[in-house]
Amino acid sequence: MERIGGQVKDQEELAKQVLSWITCAKRPLTTSELQHALAVEVGESALDEENLPQIEDIVSVCAGLVAVDKESNIIRLVHYTTKEYFERTQNHWFPNAETDITAICVTYLSFHAFESGFCQTDAEFEERLRLNQLYDYIAHNWGNHAREALTLCQQVIGFLESELKIEAASQALLAIKRYSGHSKYSQEL
């Protein structure tokens, strides 16, 4: 962490965001999910793709603490003891991580892309997933992050007041993969 702290401010901040997301994530994140998480600007109504950090930059600023699995495209801490360390010392290194992640999650779910509510077809839903890489993770886990947050952020209230955005998030919870390991989804219950 000394090496991370010795970087220029923007790189140090990026490294801490990466490490907090990887430490606090409720399941392993893909590189594209993490890129989207890092690119969200709280309070904005759309993702600015110019904010997507390059994977090489993400790995570099973390000073050897993270690695990308080439087969699964999962970004993770290099060793399980590193994860255990950050989980144990989370309040020291990332004291507001769950609050910050909650704000990012709810901002993402409040994007204009979800204002249409429930997708009418499987193809439309799959396209929504493809275009919004973090959507599935956030729809399933934003509530868990909110429950662990130190404070309730204003974005949660705004999100909960939008029936169509709630519908869109709920759809991701209800949709199931047709076949294990297959990218096709079905909305049939």
Residue ranges and their predicted role:
Residues M1-L189:
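Leucine/isoleucine-rich amphipathic helices and adjacent mixed helix/strand linkers
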